[in-house]
Swiss-Prot record:
Reactions mediated catalytically: tRNA(Ser) + L-serine + ATP = L-seryl-tRNA(Ser) + AMP + diphosphate + H(+); tRNA(Sec) + L-serine + ATP = L-seryl-tRNA(Sec) + AMP + diphosphate + H(+)
Pathway the protein acts in: Aminoacyl-tRNA biosynthesis; selenocysteinyl-tRNA(Sec) biosynthesis; L-seryl-tRNA(Sec) from L-serine and tRNA(Sec): step 1/1
Species annotation: Rhodococcus jostii (strain RHA1)
Gene symbol of the encoding locus: serS
PROSITE patterns noted in UniProt: AA_TRNA_LIGASE_II
Protein name: Serine--tRNA ligase
Compartments where found: Cytoplasm
Amino acid sequence: MIDLKFLRENPDAVRESQRTRGEDPALVDALLEADASRRAAVLAGDNLRAEQKAFGKKVGQASPEERPALLEGSKELAAKVKQAEAEQHEAQAALDAAHRAISNVVQEGAPAGGEDDFVTLETVGDIPAFDFEPKDHLELGESLGLIDMERGAKVSGARFYFLTGFGAMLQLGMLQLAAQKAMANGFQMMIPPVLVRPEIMAGTGFLGAHADEVYHLADDDLYLVGTSEVPLAGYHSGEILDLADGPKRYAGWSTCFRREAGSYGKDTRGIIRVHQFDKVEMFTYCKPEDADAEHQRLLAWEREMLAAIDVPYRVIDVAGGDLGSSAARKFDCEAWVPTQQAYRELTSTSNCTTFQARRLGVRYRDENGKPQTAATLNGTLATTRWIVAILENHQQSDGTVRVPEALVPFVGTDVLKP
């Protein structure tokens, strides 16, 4: 949730953020109205309770003759207090609903527009110039015994797969390398639960416009996570953190689940867009004033991993209309996929400022010992989709694939052969 104090002082900035996202700026006015109504209801209730307290003292000091009339007045006042409390509760519920309808305030400098309006910040590496017709990742994966989509579909349905043999080792090696790099940079490794309570899923912002992307176990009222960002954000919910020595950094290794409800007909071939995949995700809690610098650090660590797998990629500044509701700014790294003649997302890092932490009640103490809302950030360090870029960019004319040098110790071979 956004900071209501910021909203009251900067309503035009929040309206502009809504426009940048392509969302309704009128929601800002609805929130301001709900905020004013709730504050008025609280004031009215407080005044009545103060009056009730003073009236109670008057009753206690009254003579026997005066008391019956005063008691009758006390009953009337009690009824008014009860009504005021009901109105306050109703006003709070309306405020909560209006508050949750507003996405995070887009950071100044982020591009306006939608999915195609990103700004390319840098392009890294040389696009391979093959002297043969390159195969796509699925053809390579099947011919080398790395990917089995047919049996994945037989067992689980469309967009499921088996990683087999060195395909499994390639993923495990990639994730293990990511875990080692995370630990070397001060992250605490975590294997989190992949089922979370509704309040944790909602707190991270995943039950808004894209709620249909999330798997829900209705009988247990639990959600399957699409990223370990969710349980890691909930890890310190309701706590006051000690950030005096700098950010708290966690790296979660988990299986992730996405319904891909809005992706019918898109990327139906191979493992680019699937219902289940594995990922190592970086997650940071820090002071708000440290968030921008931390965002750049997360991006730098992602780039280190992409350098390790030796694929050409570009870094983009994602436009406001393509941001998730929790993100104020997002940078993606997209790798070149030769057979698509296009760049495809491999990593994403988001600065969620205080949006998630405010929902989840994560705070820290400032230099005066006063609790303040923390900032949260996240970023991909490795995920299943990377196999696509590795296979296609490192394929050779004889149908084999060269294993990136950094992954050889984990995979156990330097060339993937039939």
